[in-house]
From Swiss-Prot:
SUPFAM superfamilies: dsRNA-binding domain-like, Ribosomal protein S5 domain 2-like. The keyword Ribonucleoprotein applies. It comes from the Bacteria. It comes from Bifidobacterium longum (strain DJO10A). This is Small ribosomal subunit protein uS5. NCBIfam families: rpsE_bact. Belongs to the universal ribosomal protein uS5 family. Keywords: Ribonucleoprotein, Ribosomal protein, RNA-binding, rRNA-binding. Residues 1-50 are annotated as: Disordered. With S4 and S12 plays an important role in translational accuracy. Located at the back of the 30S subunit body where it stabilizes the conformation of the head with respect to the body.
Length: 243
C-alpha cells in the first residue's frame, strides 16, 4: 500500500469517528432536551391547573423567625396568606418553612382548608359587625355602591379575596398583621343573613332588616336576573347565527 493510500485511509477513519461522536452528542442533547421539556411541561400543567381553580391569593406578610437550639439557631420564614374566590368565600392560612416559596405554599394550603362563606348584598356586608383577636379589634360597616374598600393593607387583602367591593373599616388596638387579619375573619364569621335573624327572633323579615338593605337586595336580584337574561339572549343569537 502506498503512502497516499495510507493517508486517505487514515483521513476516512478520522472522518467516520468525528461523525459518530457528533451523532452521539446530538442524541445526548436531544434526550436532555426531552427530559427538560418533560419537566417544564409538568410544571406548566401544574400552573395551569392551579390557575384553573380560579382562586385569588394575597400574601399579607412574610416574617423571618428563628429557633434557638443547643448547637445554635435555625432560621425560617413564616407567611400569612389569604385565599378566596372573589365571590363570597375566603380563608386565611399560616405557613412556615426554611424557604419563602415553600412557606407561601403551606400558607395557601392552610387557607384553603379554612375557607368559609361570607353573606353579601350587592358587594357589601349585611350589617355592622366588630371582630376581635388578641389585642386587635376591627370594625366593619356596610357602604353604598361605589364607595370602595376603605381599609388598610391587611384588611383590604381579606375583603378583596372575599369579593367585598364596598365597605367601611376601622382597625383599633394591635396593628400586628396577624392580629388584624384574624380579627377581620372573626368579624366576617359573625355576619348573618336577614332571614336567619328573623327566623331566630320569630319576626317578619321587614321587621328585622332595614329598608336600605331590602332595597339593595331587591336591586341585586333584579340585576342578576337581567344579566342572566342578557346572557341567554346572546347565547341564543350565537346559536342562530351558527345555523
Amino acid at each position: 500500500m502506498s503512502d497516499n493510500e495510507t493517508k486517505e485511509t487514515q483521513v476516512a477513519e478520522e472522518t467516520q469517528n468525528t461523525v459518530a461522536t457528533e451523532s452521539n452528542n446530538e442524541d445526548r442533547k436531544g434526550r436532555r432536551g426531552q427530559r427538560g421539556e418533560g419537566r417544564r411541561g409538568e410544571r406548566r400543567n401544574r400552573r395551569e391547573e392551579n390557575h384553573g381553580d380560579e382562586l385569588l391569593d394575597r400574601v399579607v406578610t412574610i416574617n423571618r423567625v428563628s429557633k434557638t437550639h443547643k448547637g445554635g439557631r435555625t432560621f425560617s420564614f413564616a407567611a400569612l396568606v389569604v385565599v378566596g374566590d372573589g365571590n363570597g368565600t375566603v380563608g386565611v392560612g399560616y405557613g412556615k418553612s426554611r424557604e419563602v416559596p415553600a412557606a407561601i405554599a403551606k400558607g395557601q394550603l392552610d387557607a384553603k382548608k379554612h375557607m368559609f362563606s361570607v353573606p353579601r348584598v350587592r358587594g357589601t356586608i349585611t350589617h355592622p359587625v366588630q371582630g376581635h383577636d388578641a389585642a386587635g379589634t376591627v370594625l366593619l360597616r356596610p357602604a353604598a355602591p361605589g364607595t370602595g374598600v376603605i381599609a388598610g393593607g391587611s384588611v383590604r387583602a381579606v375583603m378583596e379575596c372575599a369579593g367585598i367591593t364596598d365597605v367601611l373599616t376601622k382597625s383599633m388596638g394591635s396593628a400586628t398583621a396577624v392580629n388584624v387579619v384574624r380579627a377581620t375573619v372573626d368579624a366576617l364569621k359573625q355576619l348573618e343573613e336577614p332571614e336567619e335573624i328573623a327566623a331566630r327572633r320569630g319576626l317578619a323579615l321587614d321587621e328585622v332588616a332595614p329598608d336600605a338593605l331590602l332595597r339593595a337586595r331587591a336591586a341585586g336580584i333584579a340585576e342578576a336576573r337581567k344579566a342572566r337574561e342578557e346572557a341567554a339572549a346572546a347565547k341564543a343569537a350565537e346559536e342562530k347565527d351558527g345555523e
